[in-house]
Amino acid sequence: MRQNLLETYSRQLKVAEAYVAKNFEGKTMSSNTALTTAVLLDNTNRWITESLNSEIGATTRDSMGAWKKFCLNLTNIAVPSLIANDLVIVHPMTSYSGSVAYLEYVSLTNKGDVKKGDVFNSVWGHGEMNEARQNFTSQVIVETVGDDGKLTLADSLVTGGLSYRDEETREYKTATYKVNGEYTDDASKVVAGAKVAYMTEQFQMNHIPSKEIPAIGPRMKHIPLVAEPRRIAVRYDQITAFQAKTDYGFSLDKQIAEQACGELAYEIDTEIVAMLKDGAKAGTSEDEFKALTWSKTLPVGVSKFEHYNGFLEVVETAKAIIYNRTKKFHPNYMVVASDILPVLRFVNGFTAVKNVKMNGPYKVGELDGMNVYVSPIMESGEFFLGLNGNDMMSSAGVYAPYMAIVPTQLLGTPDGGMAQGFSTWYAKALLNKNLLVRGSIVA
């Protein structure tokens, strides 16, 4: 089906590729963007054909074919121009509802501090690699001693001595088990509050029943996606449209339609940025935000160039935070407030876009290969970093369009007024806030 759609709309896709290359400094459309555009062209084509046919009610336009072509051209240009394509994964929908399915791998058994259901590996990142996890498949059991100095043996086969790590010296020592559930060291002091690893000669793989061997397994989860409509109406006077055509040589109805579609595109990009911004705020701890708060006030004896270039340290710290959370990802884009641009101009590795094409949020340049965008929804000094990979599992969010730009019939009233509606249908969802982190530049 996908290949058929790409072939069916190959001519329109070539036009879209040429438009993107011309207006976005030679940028090429990704295969996912091309497929998304083809699916939306097909959805829009079928919608217009069905909704404006003779059974439902004939359109008032003289040339239905020309108007349909115009609407498809709007889709062809609007979809590839969205910066949402660069900030989140775009998943076209062939129905107004769908879901994202993914797997995560969890522990199926208890072994020391590793409990049944603990996540080992997920599409969103790896689980915590602590001392207990390191020894999950070994003969060693790692378990936390309670405040009372007692612990419950994880397996009935485990008996005998205990190897524990001294919290002060960080050395491993040997303790002796007592019948009352306590362990004492060589000085007969109760071992408490330390991470311990205890083993026994009886704890061998070939001595354990198969059901007791440490095991992991998959768990499938779903994220629902339901497309919701966004609508806008355009109204104008019939005589005004006539004067525009005869006196100035342009079609007012198409001009207004393009403006309406531009407004829809502006809102889509802004809504996606707002979703990511809120996700970054929710996913960033106080300590992380404090580490990513940078003052542009010049220290005594330091030039503006040297100090502003130090903002790179904050960017690298943000990258490290996302990597430490997931153990597998780095951010590849940054969204900033407009007043951060003067700082970026001083940062080594920043390359500005020469011919900026903007409709609300826009791409301003690159910083060491990381795309940088400006959005009017960002408050003064705000910025956040995020990741948009090649699939939903490596992206912070998803934009799932169902209908790109679909029109209603053009209606006329007795007083000469003309009215028409335009709508877009799409779903969106925040997938992984661990792929987002926010910071701030203060005075």
Residue ranges and their predicted role:
Residues M1-I141, G149:
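Extended assembly-interface regions of large multimeric machines
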Residues M64-K68, S97-Y102, R231-A233, K328-M334, ...:
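Beta-sheet entry/capping signal
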Residues T75-P80, S95-F136, L162-T270:
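Acidic/polar, low-complexity extended loops/arms that serve as protein-protein interfaces
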Residues P80-V90, N180-T184, I216-M220, T317-I321, ...:
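Short alpha-helical segments and helix-capping/turn motifs at coil-helix boundaries
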Residues G125, Q202, N206, A215-E258, ...:
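Sequence/fold signature of self-assembling virion shell proteins
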Residues G146-G160:
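Surface-exposed beta-strand/loop patches in extracellular or lumenal glycoproteins
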Residues Y236-Q238, S251-T317:
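Alpha-helical scaffold segments that mediate packing/assembly in large oligomeric complexes
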Residues E286-K357:
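Extended, solvent-exposed, turn-rich assembly/linker loops in the middle of proteins
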